[in-house]
């Protein structure tokens, strides 16, 4: 017969009315204790569930309001019977299409499960505990997140007039600096760094520091002085990598496809940490088809330009200041607590992004939508601000 011994802890539990013991779990790495999980824009379905609002528009995550290219949708459908197969781990056909479009070689390309994965690869490849990255403030938060996961830290350089202060960023580089991020156009401000400014900045960056040019929104830029960053790679510049995505103008955010362009040596090192089969089969075929549909890209630019002009005029009529944008979103000062206005907009079926997460409590970041979406947003905003 087995007799279970009564331990002191068991007796204490019995004395307290059989309370559940507190679970002891394995200790996580110190580096991640200070990390705050990324909070994405609310999905439409979540707002419908929580608030019971039937008609909801999302202007929070800078997606293409026209959706994906019809050619991409057709490619998905035609490839659907092959999803039992592993995808091409090398993304050969997508690299082939990108190389032809960009004027680079396939060995200059790395494909990721969104550019977020490439940011993770960069941190895993270059960041040791105690290393630093240099970023603008405000900018895309995933740069800091990727560095923190590896035990690094972000040196944040405040923007000037909502633009990168490149001189201050160059001055912030130390022997501990491994990566410098230039989000161009910048998220959330929509401002850009021009060709001359970027050329001058790169001359100040040591060869040992990799400059990451995040051009997720470059397809929307109309400014003539926007940099031709691919020329750096074609010329063999060894400390630059360009990141671009299929999540914005190509309308494939739900499939997660992004890519990096750099000299082969950088690509080789990033491939050391890349997961096998990291880009799924459907994402690859859709991206190839989307890349070839220039008419859809052109229409998307047209809708964005018209929407930008409309929102500018409406903000001005409301007496609201905004940051002129080169992207598909606008950073606007609503002169009230953005969190409260955000909640009121949700009740009216409009999802936007609050500025407090970027350090601007009275700002909203609003994706430029279709004419109907823009009018719905402005109508709701007018009612709230009245």
UniProtKB/Swiss-Prot annotation:
GO terms for molecular function: histidinol-phosphate transaminase activity; pyridoxal phosphate binding. Keywords: Amino-acid biosynthesis, Aminotransferase, Histidine biosynthesis, Pyridoxal phosphate, Transferase. InterPro entries: Aminotransferase_I/II_large (IPR004839), HisP_aminotrans (IPR005861), HistidinolP_aminotransfase (IPR050106), PyrdxlP-dep_Trfase (IPR015424), PyrdxlP-dep_Trfase_major (IPR015421), PyrdxlP-dep_Trfase_small (IPR015422). Residues 1-11 have a biased composition (Polar residues). Its cofactor is pyridoxal 5'-phosphate. Residues 1-22 are annotated as: Disordered. Pathway: Amino-acid biosynthesis; L-histidine biosynthesis; L-histidine from 5-phospho-alpha-D-ribose 1-diphosphate: step 7/9. It catalyses: L-histidinol phosphate + 2-oxoglutarate = 3-(imidazol-4-yl)-2-oxopropyl phosphate + L-glutamate. One of its GO terms (biological process) is L-histidine biosynthetic process. Gene3D superfamilies: Aspartate Aminotransferase, domain 1 (3.90.1150.10), Type I PLP-dependent aspartate aminotransferase-like (Major domain) (3.40.640.10). The modification N6-(pyridoxal phosphate)lysine is found at residue 248. Disulfide bonds: none annotated. Its EC number is 2.6.1.9. It is an enzyme of class 2 (transferase). Homodimer. Belongs to the class-II pyridoxal-phosphate-dependent aminotransferase family. Histidinol-phosphate aminotransferase subfamily. NCBIfam families: hisC. PANTHER family: HISTIDINOL-PHOSPHATE AMINOTRANSFERASE, HISTIDINOL-PHOSPHATE AMINOTRANSFERASE 2. This is Histidinol-phosphate aminotransferase.
